[in-house]
């Protein structure tokens, strides 16, 4: 019979929310610094905004549209900042609360914004445009003043050409009524704001890139596109005081070398009188192999600091926020294309500060991710212990504290541990602690060291990423780790606290090759053109503490062919088995005795139900390995000796581009050659119940088939899980880890197997515990099948014309549910085992993850549509490897090549998220402005302030034309609320539709059950 199970879930239990973002901001474009709050803001090409403070203070927000950030200006010590974007908008952000929000915006309709400038303690923002005009925006009301500086009034009347875009705006430090305007062509204008006219004009010899004032207000420096610096005086001289080409040398012809542009320059002084001139670029063109650089000029000393990546922007960190006094610089923040570095200006040699943020996530491209929530509590200390011992402390860093010390870190974290594993293209695996709002690296495992370097060639002639990690399977309790690499190998690692010296066992598993529709078994033999893509280091090797290689399974490859990709991987430490599947079949390895116990080809998996009517040709089990260093204790633990029955479940995806598969694949694709393959997409270990039987041992000679029951679903299988009779996840068995260095003197005993995730059934459930459910989820639908009757008790069509990218059965609030990420960008959740819809929310467009698309196009125009479809499908598989769901409703995905984005589907965790987020704004007193001496004030050479409200206000200057810009007062929080309301409404409509279909499905299932048992006697039931 079918027992109807109550669902503990409701729609209020599940709520999708993005939580924390970690890594380096992808494609940065601008940077700014608040010297009082000591916060750093970085804008990106995609509209993201990261605000960084002390370690643990890291906030991410994003503009509504994917528009690049041009420039950022802090409202010093006010808890706000202004951003200018490429859609010609100016946004005011408020970060006095934990989650920054847009307060107001204004979008220019007829002008293109090129630069902005906000004077200290001013509410009027200066906006320069591509047409050469300057506007004034009130950041409190976002009203544009009628005071406008037009380009034709700023230049000389005799000038016949347009001066170009405004590239720089800055006030005179001592006279705020004088505005220095820098145009792209090199035209400089000192504008008198009170008199509304140009006080003086200069023309630089080369196009202009940036300007920086001396704090005395009497001179300034300009940087140019020819790599030169020009120094100017405000004493109405038409020529520069000096022209300096810092990196130009005289060649053999007696001429100066041509140099690259100096993109930005800053002129900063210490109170002692020493001056720093800091700029980026300016190196000679003909210097081969010259790296991007930052140059620091201190007096006659010139220091060139080479960078690993292109310099995007930099900002000098100063103690003094007042620009009319010596700013006292102490550090320089340099934003590179793929890194963030901070230079110590006060230490000889200008060493770097050691970066406390996880900015090296993309040190090697991320190829796969695994997320483990609620893992054993002793795992993080163990990883950190071996990681700290294995990594030598880097030298050459500044001994001073990290200069970005703003905000307050929240010590609140989850009551359970979270670990993230990232696999990389160079074969490394990084272990991260993600328990709190921050991300800290624990340990780095380099799998490429297991192989010989001189044999790391690809058999198809390419050398691209032979060690790239494609799949990761970790048993946290036993601390056994399986890694599948790009060169068709699988590695098993065991965790040990101490260094060891041993030999790594190697198994060469035979493969299948398909010729003219017939499968042949190939073993490497003399004269055959076979080979191994990689070769394991032979002999006894010294292995550092941590995960040490224990077993490597290799697959031989035909020369000129690509290695067969590993498509599924799983390990069960309790059984002592490791299983992996590829495009040709499946292999099961006894990891205790280091032998292949099962090697089955795809035809044998079908058995008599093979739709292609092929002759099964599977290899015999390989001979036991010659590795003799297995302990006696481990041998007695071998699953070959234990009487343990294993329920093995897998799915074969046949012809990934066939019309029977998902993603609207064309049926004509099956006529293309060399694209038909069958790959094991998913496999799982599970216990079956055998206690209510009587076992008789007979020796029968029968024809043996590997196959069992076959369940066919539309689309490839993505995940499977097993539920007990009460609908709870069946506990998976594991072997507890033990410290071999501590227990090696003890008497060997058989290790006890434990279980995790839920308690074993007892009491009243004992009679019903021989029943269980298997949940099978494909790219199109989900089914719940009762075992051992194999009746489909629940089914759900997840999508029609789209497909599921990633799905997982997770535990959430003492129950389980199915969570799926759909290709339409939506996240859907269903209760188990009833598959009742819980939520259907718009989450993330799949196009936002298209940066992982690396496949080239097809030249043949007749195949362009098919080929593009094929590559999209393969890239979707790569996206699925970096998209993870975990227990407790946690999840993450690779949102850019350099960043990880965490999210949650738990409403309970979403409610407590605010407590885990750090405070960005912390009240500080504004530093007192430097006092002027009596004689400076007497002779009128002190600071001249400006009443900007009187000058730019509506009463004196009026408002600009309404057609000039559009005011947008709505905050981002309001927009987010509207989006949530729309998603909630769509979810309610979907739930109502499902409630209509549920009675029909139940009626159909009941009718089918009645027909099945209608004509059977009572003893046949």
PLM feature spans:
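Surface-exposed loop and turn segments in beta-propeller and other repeat-based domains
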Residues: 148-160, 243-258, 310, 357-397, ...
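Intrinsically disordered, low-complexity regions in large eukaryotic scaffold subunits
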Residues: 319-322, 342, 363-376, 382, ...
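Canonical WD40 repeat/beta-propeller blade segments in eukaryotic WD-repeat proteins
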Residues: 23-32, 67-74, 110-118, 155-172, ...
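Short coil/turn segments within WD40 beta-propeller repeats
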Residues: 46-49, 87-90, 131-134, 185-188, ...
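Per-blade loop-tip surfaces of WD-repeat and WD-like beta-propellers in eukaryotic adaptors/scaffolds
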Residues: 6-17, 51-61, 89-105, 131-163, ...
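Structural hallmark of WD40 beta-propellers
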Residues: 37-41, 59, 78-82, 102, ...
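N-terminal alpha-helical scaffolding segments that mark the starts
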Residues: 1-50, 59-62, 85
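Extended amphipathic alpha-helical scaffold segments
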Residues: 299-302, 306, 316-320, 327, ...
């Amino acid at each position: 019979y079918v027992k109807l199970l109550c669902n503990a879930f409701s729609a209020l239990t599940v709520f999708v929310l993005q939580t924390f973002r970690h890594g380096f901001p992808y494609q940065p474009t601008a940077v700014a610094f608040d010297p009082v709050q000591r916060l750093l803001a970085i804008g990106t090409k995609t509209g993201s905004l990261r605000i960084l403070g002390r370690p643990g203070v890291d906030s991410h927000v994003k503009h509504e549209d994917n528009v690049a950030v041009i420039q950022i200006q802090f409202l010093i010590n006010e808890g706000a900042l202004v951003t200018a974007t490429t859609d010609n908008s100016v946004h005011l952000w408020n970060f006095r609360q934990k989650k920054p929000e847009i307060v107001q915006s204004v979008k220019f309709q007829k002008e293109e914004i090129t630069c902005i400038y906000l004077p200290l303690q001013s509410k009027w923002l200066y906006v320069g445009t591509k047409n050469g005009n300057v506007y004034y925006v009130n950041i409190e009301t976002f009203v544009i003043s009628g005071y406008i500086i037009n380009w034709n009034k700023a230049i000389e009347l005799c000038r016949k050409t347009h001066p170009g875009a405004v590239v720089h705006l800055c006030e005179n430090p001592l006279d705020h009524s004088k505005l220095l305007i820098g145009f792209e062509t090199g035209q400089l204008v000192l504008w008198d704001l009170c008199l509304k006219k140009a006080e003086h004009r200069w023309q630089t010899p080369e196009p202009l890139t940036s300007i920086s004032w001396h704090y005395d207000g009497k001179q300034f420096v300009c940087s140019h596109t020819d790599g030169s610096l020009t120094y100017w005086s405000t004493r109405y001289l038409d020529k520069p005081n000096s022209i300096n080409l810092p990196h130009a040398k005289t060649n053999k012809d007696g001429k100066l070398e041509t140099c690259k542009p100096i993109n930005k320059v800053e002129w900063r002084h210490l109170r002692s009188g020493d001056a720093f001139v800091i700029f980026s670029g300016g190196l000679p063109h003909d210097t081969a192999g010259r790296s991007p650089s930052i140059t620091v000029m201190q007096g006659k000393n010139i220091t060139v600091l080479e960078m690993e990546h292109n310099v995007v922007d930099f900002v000098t960190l100063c103690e003094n926020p007042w620009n009319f006094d010596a700013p006292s610089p102490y550090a320089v923040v340099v934003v590179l294309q793929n890194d963030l570095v901070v230079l110590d200006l006060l230490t000889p040699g200008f060493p770097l500060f050691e970066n406390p943020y996880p900015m090296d996530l993309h040190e090697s491209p991320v190829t796969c991710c695994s997320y483990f929530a609620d893992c054993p509590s002793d795992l993080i200390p163990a990883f950190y212990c071996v990681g700290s011992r294995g990594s030598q402390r880097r030298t050459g860093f500044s001994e001073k504290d990290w200069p970005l010390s703003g905000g307050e870190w929240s010590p609140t974290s989850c009551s359970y541990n979270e670990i993230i594993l990232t696999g990389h293209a160079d074969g490394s695996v990084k272990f991260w602690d993600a328990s709190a709002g921050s991300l800290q690296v624990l340990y780095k495992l380099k799998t490429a060291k297991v192989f010989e370097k001189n044999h790391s060639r690809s058999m198809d002639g390419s050398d691209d990423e032979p060690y790239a990690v494609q799949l990761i399977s970790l048993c946290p309790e036993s601390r056994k780790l399986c890694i599948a690499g790009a060169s068709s190998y699988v590695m098993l690692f065991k965790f040990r606290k101490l260094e060891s010296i041993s030999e790594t066992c190697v198994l060469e598993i035979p493969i299948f090759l398909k010729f003219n529709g017939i499968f042949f078994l190939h073993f490497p033999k003399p004269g055959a053109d076979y080979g191994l893509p990689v070769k394991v280091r032979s002999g006894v090797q010294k292995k550092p503490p941590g995960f040490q290689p224990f077993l490597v399974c290799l697959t031989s490859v035909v020369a000129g062919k690509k290695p067969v990709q590993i498509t599924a991987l799983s390990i069960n430490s309790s059984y002592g088995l490791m299983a992996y599947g590829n495009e040709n079949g499946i292999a099961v390895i006894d990891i205790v005795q280091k032998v292949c116990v099962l090697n089955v080809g795809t035809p044998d998996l079908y058995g008599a139900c093979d739709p292609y009517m092929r002759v099964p040709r599977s290899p015999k089990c390989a001979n036991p390995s010659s590795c003799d260093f297995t302990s006696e204790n481990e041998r007695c633990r071998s699953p070959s000796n234990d009487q343990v029955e294993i329920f093995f479940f897998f799915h074969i995806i046949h012809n990934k581009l066939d019309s029977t598969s998902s993603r609207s694949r064309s049926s004509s694709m099956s006529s293309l050659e060399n694209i038909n393959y069958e790959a094991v997409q998913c496999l799982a270990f599970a216990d079956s119940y055998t206690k209510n039987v009587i076992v008789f041992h007979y020796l029968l000679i029968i024809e043996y088939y590997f196959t069992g029951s076959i369940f066919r679903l539309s689309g490839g299988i993505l995940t499977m899980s097993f539920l007990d009779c009460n609908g709870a996840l069946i506990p998976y068995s594991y072997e507890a880890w033990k410290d071999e260095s501590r227990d090696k003197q003890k008497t060997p005993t058989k290790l006890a197997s434990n279980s995790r995730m839920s308690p074993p059934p007892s009491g009243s459930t004992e009679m019903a515990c021989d029943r269980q459910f298997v949940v099978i989820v494909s790219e199109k639908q989900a089914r719940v099948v009762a075992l051992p009757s194999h009746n489909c008790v629940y089914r759900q069509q997840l999508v029609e014309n789209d497909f599921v990218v990633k799905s997982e059965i997770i535990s959430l609030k003492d129950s389980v549910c199915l969570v799926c990420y759909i290709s339409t960008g939506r996240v859907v959740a269903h209760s188990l085992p009833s598959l009742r819809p819980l939520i259907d929310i718009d989450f993330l467009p799949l196009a936002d993850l298209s940066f992982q698309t690396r496949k080239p196009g097809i030249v043949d125009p007749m195949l362009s549509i098919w080929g593009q479809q094929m590559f999209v499908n393969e890239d979707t598989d790569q996206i699925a490897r970096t998209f993870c769901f975990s227990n407790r409703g946690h999840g993450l995905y690779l949102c850019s090549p350099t960043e990880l984005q965490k999210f949650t589907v738990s409403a309970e965790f979403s409610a407590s998220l605010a407590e885990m987020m750090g405070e960005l704004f912390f009240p500080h007193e504004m530093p007192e402005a430097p006092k002027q001496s009596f004689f400076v004030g007497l002779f009128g050479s002190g600071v001249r302030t400006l009443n900007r409200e009187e000058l730019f206000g509506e009463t004196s200057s009026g408002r600009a034309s309404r057609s000039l810009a559009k005011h947008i007062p709505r905050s981002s929080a309001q927009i987010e609320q509207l989006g949530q309301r729309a998603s909630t409404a769509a979810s309610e409509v979907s739930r109502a539709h499902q409630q209509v279909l549920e009675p029909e499905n139940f009626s159909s299932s009941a009718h089918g059950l009645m027909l099945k048992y209608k004509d059977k006697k009572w003893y046949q039931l």
